[in-house]
From Swiss-Prot:
Organism: Cereibacter sphaeroides (strain ATCC 17023 / DSM 158 / JCM 6121 / CCUG 31486 / LMG 2827 / NBRC 12203 / NCIMB 8253 / ATH 2.4.1.)
First and last residue of the signal peptide: none
Annotated residues for binding of [4Fe-4S] cluster: C136, C140, C143
Entries under PROSITE patterns matching the protein: RADICAL_SAM
Name of the protein: Dual-specificity RNA methyltransferase RlmN
Ranges of residues in domain Radical SAM core: 122-364
Amino acid sequence: MTANAPITQDVMTLPRKLPEGGPVNIVGLTREELLAALVAAGTPERQAKMRAGQVWQWVYHWGVRDFAQMTNLAKDYRALLAEHFAIVLPEVVTRQISADGTRKYLIRIAGGHEVETVYIPEEGRGTLCVSSQVGCTLTCSFCHTGTQKLVRNLTAAEIVGQLMLVRDDLGEWPERGAPKDETRLVSNLVLMGMGEPLYNFENVRNAMKVVMDGEGLSLSRRRITLSTSGVVPEIARTAEEIGCQLAISFHATTDEVRDILVPINKRWNIRTLLDSLRDYPRLSNSERITFEYVMLDGVNDTDADARRLVKLISGIPSKINLIPFNEWPGAPYRRSTPERIAAFADIIYKAGYASPIRTPRGEDIMAACGQLKSATERARKSRAQIAAETGL
């Protein structure tokens, strides 16, 4: 861990246009942006709202990637769309499937950069963990992603594209003319992959607008959870402009320990963070905030820590997710023992808070919480990485 690592950033987000003078990528445009783009391309204003709705449904409900297949649009209008627009997703480089069914995707985005996306199937639901940045600036000492330097923000298209690619892989797009199937393989989405979502607020917000739209991908805001290490100035804005569920990467009950585990705490300490959370359930219409707490042997797992945690979150509708530390090569910590984790959970439960212990998933493919890191960073430098680092 670098003690003086930067905790703010001024990073690049690639422009939405495809290679110089090329068509505009529709993926990731909000409805308002799509409507404006259609008008700019020559769609009569009186028709633009209807046309935007039709294109939206083809792309996000049916999963169509070819304008020629949008058969309720006139042929000349399909030609206009093909001239000015494209439907472009990131590229799946590799897919690994864990013994427990977890799927990890290495996804290549513009510039040759790579991020990881994880799908976790469970009985009755499936959760997709998406990334919001290439690398991370926060250098949390227990997190593998934190050892990879920040390269850039993902665009809204690259965030939405992760969900669309996984739906491709799972065969989840509906079949036209077939009976409607209400079963959702991807029923929940968590912004808990690589990066700090609130350091990429605008793109994350716009991506979630697309994901939550009822005529397309249609994931309810109650089934979307954004995890932040505590970017305090953006928390109220998250409630008002996104309104999804909120999870806090908390992990310590004193500033002394949290400064080491989550260095952003040096800027916004525990008291400041907790004060910013008290209005979130009301502003976002969410029931409670989730506090994520990774269990590190001899670091943050004492009975005194559990009692302090309960006292700190008093008055905030909460649940505490206890996360057994998922080790990675060179990690400076060890997982707390099962007995210690159970005792910690018992103190929290007796104080009146839900305290589920997360079952590690995908450990055999390095897909568990805190283990994500681009494969090119883990292993040799590939041509894609070299190109990325030189700005190509």
